[in-house]
């Protein structure tokens, strides 16, 4: 049973899931919004909101924490210098998920996740 389990496995091993969330987070930071499956979007929302909350302080520890998760210099810099300051007075709720369509190939529910 999966009672009170904290995250979705997304049908992947732990390393694959970690790499997937890292790459989706980098894409969201770079483009501002992306269209993916609903369950991936919900997992990404949790992942990215923790990073934005950590990046809001903007100090060296924040840089190191965010870089440890993203491992991408340009995404880390953009998150800390451009994105996080916009949410300085906001306590959570930095992203929005909107369900869009059913994917043609497998009728999977798609969603757009975007930075508010």
UniProtKB/Swiss-Prot annotation:
Subunit structure, as described in the record: Part of the 50S ribosomal subunit. Contacts protein L32.
Q: Which InterPro entries match?
A: Ribosomal_bL17 (IPR000456), Ribosomal_bL17_sf (IPR036373)
Q: Which GO terms describe its cellular component?
A: cytosolic large ribosomal subunit
The protein's name in its UniProt record = Large ribosomal subunit protein bL17
Source domain of life is Bacteria
Q: Say yes or no: keyword Signal present.
A: no
Q: Which residues form a coiled coil?
A: none
Q: Which family does it belong to?
A: Belongs to the bacterial ribosomal protein bL17 family.
One annotated GO molecular function is:
structural constituent of ribosome
Q: Which PANTHER family match?
A: LARGE RIBOSOMAL SUBUNIT PROTEIN BL17M, RIBOSOMAL PROTEIN L17
Q: Which key words tag this protein in UniProt?
A: Ribonucleoprotein, Ribosomal protein
GO BP terms:
translation
